[in-house]
A protein has these predicted regions:
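Conserved N-terminal alpha-helix of the aminotransferase class I/II PLP-enzyme fold
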Residues: 2-54, 58-70, 79, 88, ...
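Gly/Ser/Thr-rich loops at beta-strand to alpha-helix junctions
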Residues: 47-57, 79-84, 156-162, 182-185, ...
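Substrate-binding/gating loop at the entrance of the active-site cleft, primarily
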Residues: 74-117
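Structural motif
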Residues: 75, 151-155, 178, 202, ...
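Short, charged, surface-exposed secondary-structure boundary motifs
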Residues: 85-86, 187-190, 209-215
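Active-site phosphate-binding strand-loop segment of PLP-dependent enzymes
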Residues: 110-181, 185, 208
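Conserved active-site segment immediately N-terminal to the catalytic lysine
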Residues: 192-206
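Active-site C-terminal subdomain of aminotransferase-like
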Residues: 206-276
Length: 276
């Protein structure tokens, strides 16, 4: 921890008991929005999570809410670039033995055995180590699964610098596109372009903002959050083992009613350091 981070921590903990948790959440979301927003004020909402791996669950939960009776197809690009936790999450499994509240969960077990994802991993490289073009494979999977609700999980600026061809994103389709920018090796303008296209963006405070590990956020374009807030969200109740009602925006009442109202003081502190 740097001296600056130590001072932020000391000040934050000293006043924490006087703060409204709900107001603190909104304040941090607004500060994050101000950091990444363009001059055109891209309309998006902030969904918090305790780690980058937890962010992987969000689009899967969203598609379950919007299409509860459809197969859930998760197309995951560059699995070699992902941590083991993100792979478990991509398969709608618990990726750890404890959740953000310290409760014991079963690593590797399905979060909800009744609603699971069908995952297609698309390798980043061939056997000789050459970077593969995954665009054709992504398009083929989507075309061959018209009966499925689809999540397209792409990377851009990965740990080894791999970048998916973002032209594969079809803004007119019902595919829910997500781009992992957790490493944040990109220009700010890319975030604005993605949000404008309706693409969800994954960020982690520990990478881009140089904060302590385990603080993450999903930037969700308003086109999705407006639809999500109007549907039955009871299908996500099992994800109360991972998320708090406070992780989602205040106006997502349909989601909040199926998640526990648990505060995470440490997560708020990590974001406070990240946003300082």
């Amino acid at each position: 921890m740097t001296r600056r981070s130590f001072n932020v921590t000391k000040a934050f903990l000293g006043k924490y008991d006087e703060l409204s948790y709900e107001n603190l959440l909104e304040n941090q979301a607004n500060r994050l929005r101000a950091l990444v927003q363009s001059e055109f004020k891209d309309p998006f909402d902030v969904f918090f999570a305790p780690s980058g791996s937890d962010l992987v669950y969000y689009p899967l939960m969203f598609q379950m809410m919007l299409n509860p009776n459809k197969r859930l197809l998760n197309i995951v690009s560059c699995p070699e670039e992902l941590g083991s936790g993100s792979k478990f999450a991509s398969e709608t499994r618990f990726y750890a033995n404890y959740n953000q509240f310290g409760d014991k969960i079963e690593k590797g077990a399905f979060v909800d055995p009744k609603n699971t994802s069908e995952v297609h991993y698309l390798d980043a490289r061939d056997a000789e180590g050459n970077i593969l073009d995954r665009t054709a494979a992504i398009n083929e999977l989507i075309a061959n699964n018209p009966d499925a609700s689809v999540v397209g999980s792409l990377v851009f600026g990965s740990k080894s610098g791999i970048k998916d061809d973002l032209n594969v994103i079809d803004t007119d389709s019902e595919t829910m596109w997500v781009v992992d920018l957790c490493q944040f090796r990109v220009d700010h303008s890319l975030i604005h372009d993605l949000l404008e296209k309706g693409v969800m963006v994954m960020l982690t405070g520990s990478k881009f903002f140089q904060a302590p590990p385990f603080c993450a956020a999903m930037l969700v374009p308003r086109k999705w959050s407006e639809r999500l807030k109007q549907v039955d969200a009871s299908i996500i109740e099992p994800y109360g083992a991972l998320f708090s009602a406070y992780d989602v925006p205040w106006f997502m009442e349909n989601m909040r009613e199926h998640l526990p109202q648990k505060e995470n003081k440490a997560l708020r502190l990590r974001w406070e350091i990240a946003l300082d």
